[in-house]
Amino acid sequence: LPARMLNTIYINIFSTLVALAITIPLGIYCAVHKRSKSDNAVQVLSIVGYSIPVYIIALLFIWLFAVTLKLLPVFGMQTPGNNFTGFRAFLDKVYYMTLPVLVMTVGSLGGMTRYVRAAMIEALSMDYIRTARAKGLREKVVIYSHAWRNALLPVITVLIGWFISIFSGSLIIEQ
């Protein structure tokens, strides 16, 4: 694969993994604590985050992290003129991938959090959940062993389409 395509794949895979690591626990928490203040706050932030186009998030993050704070590079995938090897090359690549991965992750949090929450709320309202609670199972067992397993199927279905569509967004972010 060409280097640019490989970079796109790395950015998309890492941003998807980071987004899932955030959205799954957040969506489960919001579903379990439905209509609480924290759920309402997350829902408002999710809608706002979902409404902002990814290129606007990219411009804001470039301005904040690269221009104002000077923490991250604006372009490139490695330090110019240096041929690092081993772990140092890996750290250099991670440093240059941080801003695009951060933008792609933040751009995907809103929609996925809302979808995980909706799937979990639907699963938690099923009869088998009521039966599991009536049997005296611990709430963690009910949530993770019963509800999450059944909410996972629609989440995976949407995740596949979302992962494919994220490639089109990464073309804009990488420019």
Question: Which residues are covered by each model-predicted region?
Answer:
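Membrane-interface helix-entry/capping residues at the boundaries of transmembrane alpha-helices
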Residues: 39-43
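Juxtamembrane/interface motifs at transmembrane-helix termini
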Residues: 59-63, 76-80, 95, 163-165
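Short, hydrophobic secondary-structure boundary micro-motifs
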Residues: 1, 57-58, 73-75, 132, ...
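Membrane-water interface segments at the C-terminal ends of transmembrane alpha-helices
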Residues: 45-76, 103-109
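Alpha-helical transmembrane segments of integral membrane proteins
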Residues: 5-38, 54, 84-175
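Hydrophobic alpha-helical transmembrane segments of membrane transport/permease proteins
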Residues: 1, 69-91
